[in-house]
């Protein structure tokens, strides 16, 4: 009975209509959140952008809806909504259906179509949208899109350069930059593109536009300019030579300077290094200037990229502080905040992946560290000790209490008007009576804990902060302490400083906070004495002065450097730069260098020369200058000669007496025993030296009185390793000898009547043809140095393995050799003649290649067979090869690197295409004449085109992808004087593999095909009995000549252009190859009978015009009668298959398909 009753109640068809109506109303009123098939309309949207719509859009929205959307963005953003479509039931005051928009300040209702196409912005980082509909009249609804819009600089970066003055990015006028005796400057930057060039990242200048502080990249390195002093930063930047420090990704760079250091600290890519800059000692950066991002000068470009999170402090941070530097540490002089900057919206770009950008998830508070670990962060600020009493209601462990209090202090001071740092927090520990008092306090209430924190305030713009303000700030933020922690008491006291002090020795120590203070040693630049300001918790006092660095002698420092460069030491480019700077400092400091110190320094340079050439390149100029200065300062008071020999370097110094005719000569060779590295001789010289210098007898005559005082010595330096002499601007000449340097005192001698004679042995075992004498010019290649031949000539009387150079001045001398692909072996006159022939020939070839191509394109009957189509492709390749070659020199004159690279790559491509199509001509002849039977090839011409154009394109593409474009293609000089420039392949490996090697393969293939084809022609023509011997020879000769130009046999002259036959074969090569297009036109177009008929029919008039009824087909009917008569003719005209009747008469029927495509060509003669 019970189950029966239950069953009746559960059957819906047994319910009364009133009950059904009740259930329907209940469903509609209580479940309006989702509509069948339309999804939920109560959402929280936190994506950077997106869309949302009314329920069931674009269909009509249902009745009785109540929807809401919350759009949320991180701090520093606002929300922008745009209604793409809007159609809601319209009524006065929107009393029926409506959409409500809450932007954080006000709420607005919309209905009808009023909001369509409109955009609305929120005033905060959150916006609420609600939609409701009543029980009747449905409409289409709305479609809205939303996007975050960054308003805080934390979420935006600055794009540089900004060319218009109105868009320049500068510090706001309301911000006054104070006078700086120290600073820490950090910013993130990126660079667009790989092109080089000078740039400026930021510049700070006064009203007269005098630069006071800037970061620049120049041709010879990266510089930080401080009050007129330029400090080279290269040694501290972990980047390879010629690479930019900034890439496409933002990287943070921090610069630290104090006017008492004489150096600059650089933190970049998690690497902290210092570089010396003695000229900034005691320097001051004046205040009240203007700071710009980018360059403030027209002659220097701005960094092309972006800058982000630029912050400046008027104190220094050490490695620990920089490593722990977080986004919450605001710059006390300049911060990355809207209030500090004047930036046009055109210069800003918002991104969602910035290092200090806002996120919806709250980032953890920064970890606090001890002030002692932060170096000079605490040195220039005012320090306060904060004592807080916390009531621990829930008996949390002390570690948790300390963590929560640290987070509370950090958040309390994070966005305050004063720039302060909480750098330490700990539980209060005391001794004696104070300790007993604390203990009694805790016994009275075991939930009370006393914590001490150290607060550092760095005053900016003379804004004062006192203890009462700090205490008030903490008390008003009491509510932010959570988890059962209550603030009971706060006590703030300013920590004392060590008072200013002057020692009896005359050293002044300024008033400072507890830290280590250093100042330069007297009469010893680059070294510092130190003194610590100490604290015992209640007072501060000065510690003893540490002058150990000042007492170190140059010999001691040099020996330490020598140990750093000894055997087994792997020196990087940065290490070598640092070592050269240290040695330079020692050499500059000493007035006279004795033999002991000089030997140590020479051994340092010798060890450096054992490093790789790439690591030596950056420091080569400074190293050479330092070696020259070292040679000039070697002490000669006790001896007339000084010899210093090392493994890779030797120095000889000899005294001179002005007014005498006995200047010193010098020679250096290998020793007769193994007791030393080299053997030097001043005087008559050795019999077989590695290098020798003979000075002219009248060298010291006619010197001015001033110069006579300076000329007391002659310095000779021999370089066994030549890694310091790398000419980055020339890839054609290579150094093939040792390097010998010679100088007289400290003066410049040039334009000598009688030249100085330098004999140098070659380091290469192979014979050096046409050696070039040159000297090392340190001003070339943007101060990187390079070889210069001015004032030096090679003596005509040369022995194998050495060169005698006659020069009219003194410096570093060496012997160069031109690489085999260079044209410097050709004298200037022949170079001009060959250039003239080449350009005239290429012009003629381009004209007739175009004529050949135009003929076959214009007359459809001529291009029906395979040989004609192959000839058209070969003519196209030749035409573009000649045109690009003719335009190349003109394009080079523009000096646009990218355009030069493109032209060189195109020239390379069409050269390879020409080689390839000549090879395909040979392969086609082989197939047509030798492989006669069963040689049908599907899509024959298509496959040839894929090979003929695709293979060169593949080679050039691989080169462009696998190597940097500017390393492979670029400007090349040619001619003996290297004055003419051409866009071509720079890399010798690429040239020999992809040009010489590629051509070699094609050439030998064509030679083989040429021989096979000529054997076939001569064999078949020899069977004819109705032709005289003279006719036979002439026909075969014409076949040889026509095939020679068609298959590019004349390019083989390049293999014979060396040694004594170089000039004749260069002329043959230039004449025949530049006119290849003309010869192809003559033999394979103008002399073809079917071409002549088409010309006469369509281009001639009068008696020369061929009658229209003289049809081509009539001639074709006579082909059978001509038999092998025309074989040589058809071959010489590139119409291999035109004699198909003869060939197919002997072939199987299966070959007919192939040869019928070749049967439409006529024969010439």
Swiss-Prot record:
UniProt binding sites for 17alpha-hydroxyprogesterone: 1073
Subcellular location: Cell membrane
GO terms, molecular function: collagen binding; extracellular matrix binding; G protein-coupled receptor activity; laminin binding
Notes on how activity is controlled: Forms a heterodimer of 2 chains generated by proteolytic processing that remain associated through non-covalent interactions mediated by the GAIN-B domain. In the inactivated receptor, the Stachel sequence (also named stalk) is embedded in the GAIN-B domain, where it adopts a beta-strand conformation. On activation, the Stachel moves into the 7 transmembrane region and adopts a twisted hook-shaped configuration that forms contacts within the receptor, leading to coupling of a G-alpha protein, which activates signaling.
Residue stretches making up the CUB domain: 41-149
Cysteines joined through disulfide linkages: 41-67, 94-111, 186-254, 231-277, 498-533, 521-550, 773-805, 792-807
Family: Belongs to the G-protein coupled receptor 2 family. Adhesion G-protein coupled receptor (ADGR) subfamily.
Name used for this protein in its record: Adhesion G-protein coupled receptor G6
Organism of provenance: Mus musculus
């Amino acid at each position: 009975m019970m189950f029966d009753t239950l069953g009746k109640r559960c059957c819906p068809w047994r319910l009364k209509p009133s009950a059904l109506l009740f259930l329907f109303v209940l469903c509609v009123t209580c479940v309006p959140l989702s509509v069948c098939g339309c999804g939920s309309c109560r959402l929280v949207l936190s994506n950077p952008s997106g869309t949302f719509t009314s329920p069931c859009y674009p269909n009509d929205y249902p009745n009785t809806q109540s929807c809401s959307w919350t759009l949320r963005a991180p701090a520093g953003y606002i929300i922008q909504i745009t209604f793409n479509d809007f159609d809601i039931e319209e009524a006065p005051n929107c009393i029926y259906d409506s959409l409500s928009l809450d932007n954080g300040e006000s709420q607005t209702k919309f209905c009808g179509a009023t909001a369509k196409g409109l955009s609305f912005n929120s005033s905060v980082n959150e916006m609420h949208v609600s939609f409701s509909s009543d029980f009747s009249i449905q409409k289409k609804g709305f479609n809205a899109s939303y996007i975050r819009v960054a308003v805080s600089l934390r979420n935006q970066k600055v794009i540089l350069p900004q060319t218009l003055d109105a868009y320049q990015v500068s510090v706001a006028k309301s911000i006054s930059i104070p006078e700086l005796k120290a600073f820490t400057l950090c910013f993130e930057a990126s660079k667009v593109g790989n092109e080089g060039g000078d740039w400026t990242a930021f510049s700070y200048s006064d009203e007269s536009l005098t630069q006071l502080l800037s970061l620049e990249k120049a041709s010879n390195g990266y510089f930080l300019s401080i009050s007129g002093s330029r400090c080279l930063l290269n040694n501290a930047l972990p980047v390879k030579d010629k690479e930019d420090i900034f890439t496409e990704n933002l990287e943070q760079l921090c610069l630290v300077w104090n006017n008492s250091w004489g150096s600059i600290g650089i933190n970049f890519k998690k690497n902290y290094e210092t570089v010396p800059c003695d000229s900034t000692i005691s320097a001051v950066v004046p205040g009240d200037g203007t700071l710009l991002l980018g360059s403030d000068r027209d002659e220097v470009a701005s960094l092309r990229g972006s800058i982000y999170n630029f912050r400046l402090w008027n104190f220094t941070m050490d490695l620990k502080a920089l490593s722990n530097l977080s986004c919450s540490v605001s710059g006390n002089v300049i911060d990355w905040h809207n209030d500090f900057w004047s930036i046009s919206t055109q210069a800003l770009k918002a991104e969602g992946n910035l290092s200090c950008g806002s996120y919806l998830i709250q980032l953890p508070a920064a970890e606090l560290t001890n002030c002692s670990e932060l170096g000079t962060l605490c040195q220039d600020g005012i320090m306060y000790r904060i004592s807080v009493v916390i009531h621990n209601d829930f008996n949390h462990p002390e570690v948790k209490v300390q963590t929560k209090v640290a987070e509370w202090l950090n958040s309390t001071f994070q966005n305050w008007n004063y720039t302060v740092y909480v750098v330490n927090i700990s539980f209060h520990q005391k001794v004696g009576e104070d300790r007993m008092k604390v203990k009694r306090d805790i016994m009275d209430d075991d939930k009370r804990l006393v914590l001490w924190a150290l607060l550092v305030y760095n005053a900016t713009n003379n804004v004062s902060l006192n203890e009462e303000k700090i205490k008030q700030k903490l008390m008003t933020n009491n509510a932010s302490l959570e988890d059962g922690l209550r603030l009971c008491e706060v006590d703030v006291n300013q920590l004392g400083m060590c008072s200013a002090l002057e020692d009896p020795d005359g050293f002044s120590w300024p008033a400072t906070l507890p830290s280590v203070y250093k100042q330069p040693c007297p009469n010893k630049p680059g070294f510092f004495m130190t003194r610590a300001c100490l604290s015992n918790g209640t007072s501060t006092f000065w510690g003893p002065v540490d002058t150990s660095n000042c007492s170190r002698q140059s010999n001691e420092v040099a020996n330490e450097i020598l140990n750093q460069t000894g055997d087994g030491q792997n020196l990087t480019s940065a290490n070598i730069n640092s070592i050269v700077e240290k040695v330079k400092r020692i050499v500059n400091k000493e007035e006279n260098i004795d033999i002991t110190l000089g030997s140590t320094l020479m051994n340092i340079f010798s060890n450096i020369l054992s490093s790789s050439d790439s690591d030596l390149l950056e420091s080569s100029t400074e190293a050479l200058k330092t070696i020259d200065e070292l040679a000039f300062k070697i002490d000669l008071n006790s001896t007339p000669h000084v010899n210093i020999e090392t493994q890779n370097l030797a120095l000889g110094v000899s005294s001179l007496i002005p007014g005498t005719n006995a200047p010193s000569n010098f020679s250096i060779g290998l020793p007769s025993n193994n007791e030393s590295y080299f053997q030097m001789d001043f005087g008559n010289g050795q019999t077989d030296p590695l290098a020798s210098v003979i000075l002219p007898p009248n060298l010291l005559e006619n010197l001015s009185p001033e110069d006579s005082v300076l000329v007391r010595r002659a310095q000779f330096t021999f370089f066994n390793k030549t890694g310091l002499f790398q000419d980055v601007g020339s890839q054609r000449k290579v150094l093939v000898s040792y390097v010998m340097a010679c100088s007289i005192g400290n003066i410049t001698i040039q334009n000598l009547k009688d030249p100085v004679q330098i004999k140098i042995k070659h380091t290469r075992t192979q014979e050096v043809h046409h050696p070039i004498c040159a000297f090392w010019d340190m001003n070339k290649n943007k101060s990187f140095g390079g070889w210069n031949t001015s004032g030096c000539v090679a003596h005509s009387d040369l022995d194998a393995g050495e060169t005698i150079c006659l020069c009219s001045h003194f410096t570093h001398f060496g012997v160069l050799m031109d690489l085999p692909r260079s044209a410097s072996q050709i004298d200037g006159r022949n170079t001009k003649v060959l250039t003239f022939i080449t350009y005239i020939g290429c012009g003629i070839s381009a004209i007739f290649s175009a004529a050949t191509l135009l003929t076959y394109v214009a007359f459809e009957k001529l291009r029906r067979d395979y040989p004609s189509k192959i000839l058209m492709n070969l003519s196209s390749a030749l035409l573009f090869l000649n045109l690009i070659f003719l335009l190349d020199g003109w394009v080079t004159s523009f000096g646009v690197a990218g355009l030069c690279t493109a032209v060189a790559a195109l020239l390379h491509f069409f050269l390879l295409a020409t080689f390839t199509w000549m090879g395909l001509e040979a392969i086609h002849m082989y197939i047509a004449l030798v492989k006669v039977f069963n040689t049908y090839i599907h899509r024959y011409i298509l496959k040839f085109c894929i090979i003929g154009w695709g293979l060169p394109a593949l080679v050039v593409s691989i080169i462009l992808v696998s190597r940097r474009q500017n390393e492979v293609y670029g400007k090349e000089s040619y001619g003996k004087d290297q004055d003419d420039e051409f866009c071509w392949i720079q890399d010798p490996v690429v040239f020999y593999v992809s040009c010489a090697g590629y051509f070699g393969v094609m050439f030998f293939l064509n030679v083989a095909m040429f021989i096979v084809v000529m054997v076939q022609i001569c064999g078949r023509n020899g069977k004819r009995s109705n032709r005289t011997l003279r006719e036979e020879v002439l026909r075969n000769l014409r076949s040889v000549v026509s095939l020679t130009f068609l298959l590019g046999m004349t390019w083989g002259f390049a293999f014979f252009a060396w040694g004594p036959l170089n000039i004749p074969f260069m002329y043959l090569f230039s004449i025949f190859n530049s006119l290849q297009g003309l010869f192809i036109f003559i033999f394979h177009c103008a002399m073809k009978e079917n071409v002549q008929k088409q010309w006469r029919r369509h281009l001639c008039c009068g008696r020369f015009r061929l009658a229209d009824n003289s049809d081509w087909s009539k001639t074709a009917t006579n082909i059978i009668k001509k038999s092998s008569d025309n074989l040589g003719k058809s071959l010489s005209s590139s119409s291999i298959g035109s004699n198909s009747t003869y060939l197919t008469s002997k072939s199987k029927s299966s070959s007919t398909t192939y040869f019928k495509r070749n049967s439409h060509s006529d024969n010439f003669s």
